[in-house]
């Protein structure tokens, strides 16, 4: 299912539980920290491995500059979107000294419910409307669907997310650089809007259908060295550990059984990339990669214990 390979700062993000669609994984890379993105198609993508035949999307996050004129540089931005009542607040700071530098970033995002346009030029006036929705959540139980006061609003489509990045770079003797890269992304429950609007026998089928909090943690030390020899002009050694958590929770209307499936993936990787001295006509690169995935998968069902409309426990 890994049709496209996602890479961040030289570390592959694809792991044992990746599926065909990578959008839910791409959003764990904070766009406000991206310095550039490289998209590789065709035969060039083979250099990333056999699972990159569908192409590669390589994210490069911002790197602090050593010995910059601006020793301390702070930045803050706040965005508001009226269409879905979303807020995104971002703060970052960069420290630059003679032999080392630091870049710190944190983003807090809150996305509200999406709102459709009311003008349907295609003539199907009821297309996409949401007349009913589920008000069920982890703490509240509702036996029946609720009526939507504004059917153009896609109920249960909002979520929250926080992203953190810390990067240190240290200048070592003999033209070497050491970089420590730490990334953390954590979301709230993310509902499956399509599943919560699935009908069976004229009624909504699911009272709950959520992706549990999606968490991605990355720590990656990297060494860069520049021997400047003919067959070993420069090289990179990148080690990384990633911890990824994903889960799915669902329950049907008129049922108390809630099904949960959770996955926790530990990924260790080590790769080396080397280049020879480039000439006008030729360039040559070579390297190696080692990756280990350890998956812990659990699936279980629990019966809800109710006190009126309040969920007070599970059995």
Give the ranges of each region predicted by the language model.
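Flexible loop and strand-edge segments within Gram-negative outer membrane beta-barrel domains
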Residues: 155-161, 171, 175-232, 243-265, ...
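Outer-membrane beta-barrel and related beta-rich outer-membrane complex signature
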Residues: 18, 114-122, 147-148, 178-198, ...
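Transmembrane beta-barrel wall of Gram-negative outer-membrane proteins
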Residues: 84-111, 121-189, 215
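Transmembrane beta-barrel strands of outer-membrane/channel proteins
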Residues: 76-82, 95, 104-110, 180-184, ...
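Outer-membrane beta-barrel transmembrane domain signature of Gram-negative proteins
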Residues: 212-216, 259-315
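N-terminal periplasmic accessory domains that precede
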Residues: 1-7, 23-27, 39, 52-75, ...
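Outer-membrane beta-barrel channels and translocator barrels
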Residues: 97-100, 173-175, 226-230, 277-281
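Short acidic/polar hinge/loop motifs at secondary-structure boundaries
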Residues: 13-42
């Amino acid at each position: 299912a890994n049709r496209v390979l996602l890479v961040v700062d030289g570390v592959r993000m694809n792991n044992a539980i990746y599926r065909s669609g990578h959008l839910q994984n791409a959003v764990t890379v904070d766009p406000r920290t991206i310095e550039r993105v490289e998209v590789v198609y065709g035969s060039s993508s083979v250099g990333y491995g056999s699972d990159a035949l569908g192409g590669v999307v390589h994210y490069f996050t911002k790197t602090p500059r050593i010995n910059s004129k601006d020793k301390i540089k702070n930045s803050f931005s706040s965005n508001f979107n009226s269409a879905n009542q979303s807020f995104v607040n971002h703060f970052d700071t960069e420290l630059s000294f003679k032999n080392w530098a630091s870049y710190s970033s944190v983003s807090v995002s809150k996305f509200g419910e999406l709102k459709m346009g009311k003008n349907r030029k295609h003539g199907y006036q009821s297309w996409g409307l949401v007349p009913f929705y589920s008000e069920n959540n982890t703490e509240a139980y509702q036996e029946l669907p609720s009526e939507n006061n504004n059917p153009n609003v896609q109920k249960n489509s909002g979520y929250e997310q926080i992203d953190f990045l810390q990067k240190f770079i240290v200048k070592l003797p003999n033209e070497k650089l050491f970089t420590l890269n730490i990334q953390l992304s954590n979301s709230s429950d993310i509902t499956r809007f399509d599943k919560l609007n699935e009908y069976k026998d004229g009624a909504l089928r699911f009272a709950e259908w959520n992706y549990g909090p999606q968490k991605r943690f990355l720590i990656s030390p990297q060494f860069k060295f520049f021997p400047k020899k003919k067959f070993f002009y420069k090289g990179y050694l990148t080690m990384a550990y990633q911890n990824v958590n994903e889960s799915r929770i669902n329950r049907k209307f008129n049922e108390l059984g809630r099904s949960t499936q959770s996955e926790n993936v530990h990924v260790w990787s080590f790769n080396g990339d080397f280049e020879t001295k480039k000439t006008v006509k030729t360039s040559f690169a070579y390297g190696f990669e080692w990756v280990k995935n350890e998956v812990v998968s659990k699936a279980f069902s629990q019966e809800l214990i109710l006190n009126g409309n309040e969920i007070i426990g599970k059995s």
